[in-house]
């Protein structure tokens, strides 16, 4: 009787839910927030809500496509890692061919949306970001060098620039300031996770920094990047993009981030690395929310 009533949850899962998971929606949501900040800080001479909405949809579709390609390319190593073995492809919830079609479909829709209704610069920059993450990072850098996250970090740091160009159609140094914040944030964010999952990465021969250079070296690198990040986060104030609300928020958040890095380096407990990884997500979320609110209050 119990066997009859027992149903595998994967059998109850809808195909739409599976494809939704492939897009890494939480990651995409954070990317869209940083895109909105880029839009908000850009000059608004040619701003329309219609264009902004299409831009966000196009960026989201192409980011989801990059995530799906990542699932497809990494499916074999995902099946061997404790953090990822429950993903749709290792579980057999969807076929690799269907994931390929899905990634191509939403990526194409996103690119066409940006090209036809936003501007070509944003379309090509978003496509370059997709290639940087799905091909350059996932196919090559991830397996080739412990500096994989550092080199490929530019791809994940692009959304604020994409938001900016979707409104203005041109590049601007202020947009690159936002890119720089995410670029410097990326290594300590992922290295904290890599420390926590060191054995997993070693098992599948992924040369993350803790695997190739040791945990202590990685902790030192995280601390140095945390200090550098605190300095870079002051740039929006120094160049006139933000004022006191952002300054106060950035100071508080960076003090907390550096304290986590110091604790990880000198007084680490078993869960310190994963706690820092989780805090780093809230750090970026709150930092960009503060920047957005600061800008809105200044209007």
UniProtKB/Swiss-Prot annotation:
UniProt EC number: 2.5.1.141
Topology in the lipid bilayer: Multi-pass membrane protein
One GO MF term: protoheme IX farnesyltransferase activity
Location relative to the cell: Cell inner membrane
Pathway entry: Porphyrin-containing compound metabolism; heme O biosynthesis; heme O from protoheme: step 1/1
Pfam name, any one: UbiA
Keywords: Cell inner membrane, Cell membrane, Heme biosynthesis, Membrane, Transferase, Transmembrane, Transmembrane helix
GO terms under cellular component: plasma membrane
Keyword Cell inner membrane attached: yes
InterPro entries, A to Z: Protohaem_IX_farnesylTrfase (IPR006369), UbiA_prenyltransferase (IPR000537), UbiA_prenylTrfase_CS (IPR030470), UbiA_sf (IPR044878)
Annotated TM spans: 27-47, 53-73, 97-117, 121-141, 149-169, 175-195, 222-242, 244-264, 273-293
Chief location: membrane
Keyword Transmembrane: yes
One of the GO biological process terms: heme O biosynthetic process
Catalysed conversion reaction: heme b + (2E,6E)-farnesyl diphosphate + H2O = Fe(II)-heme o + diphosphate
Entry function: Converts heme B (protoheme IX) to heme O by substitution of the vinyl group on carbon 2 of heme B porphyrin ring with a hydroxyethyl farnesyl side group.
Family: Belongs to the UbiA prenyltransferase family. Protoheme IX farnesyltransferase subfamily.
Misc: Carbon 2 of the heme B porphyrin ring is defined according to the Fischer nomenclature.
Protein name in UniProt: Protoheme IX farnesyltransferase
Source species taxonomy: Bacteria, Pseudomonadati, Pseudomonadota, Gammaproteobacteria, Vibrionales
